[in-house]
């Protein structure tokens, strides 16, 4: 999204943003005329409940049956417990057409359902999410996985991070390559 125009509007609990790519010439359509928009409404119908809809379109995608957009819809609910601890739960449905890493086949199209929870208590925050994918090429191209992580605030300027992620690949790529990674980090602000 280099060389693009962005417009954002905030009014109360409503937030709207739109972006339009203008930087490429007609011979290079990497971002020329690509577009995206998003709408967020906080405290929708009840306190702490938010909805988000977003969509972006890539005009450089060509070929029969290749989807040229990503679209997502998210529901989030925030809770504050009597102890002061906070919990956030969310669900996101994503119609994917532009991300080749979510599925194991050559086609980038499919749908993913994400489920997650975040718990915050004092200086610690813990998060877990699970993604269940459905590749358009068939069930052997799905890639389902989970992410788990936490950070602990050691002081005003230091934090420690721990995370683990695992993604189980379908057998459609011929290699059945699963992905797994672990992160340990220390951050200090000067």
Language-model features: where?
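Surface-exposed loop and membrane-interface regions of Gram-negative outer-membrane beta-barrel proteins
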Residues: 23-33, 58-63, 172, 176
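C-terminal closing repeat unit and adjoining cap/tail of repeat-based domains
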Residues: 147-169
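A short, acidic, flexible beta-alpha connecting loop/helix-capping segment that sits on the rim
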Residues: 58-61, 96, 164-170, 179
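Detector for outer-membrane/organellar transmembrane beta-barrel domains
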Residues: 36-148
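Outer-envelope exported proteins of Gram-negative bacteria
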Residues: 19, 90, 161-163
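Outer-membrane beta-barrel "beta-signal"
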Residues: 148, 152, 178-190
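Short loop/turn positions at the edges of beta-strands in beta-sheet-rich folds
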Residues: 1, 43-45, 154
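Surface-exposed coil loops of outer-membrane beta-barrel proteins
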Residues: 1-38
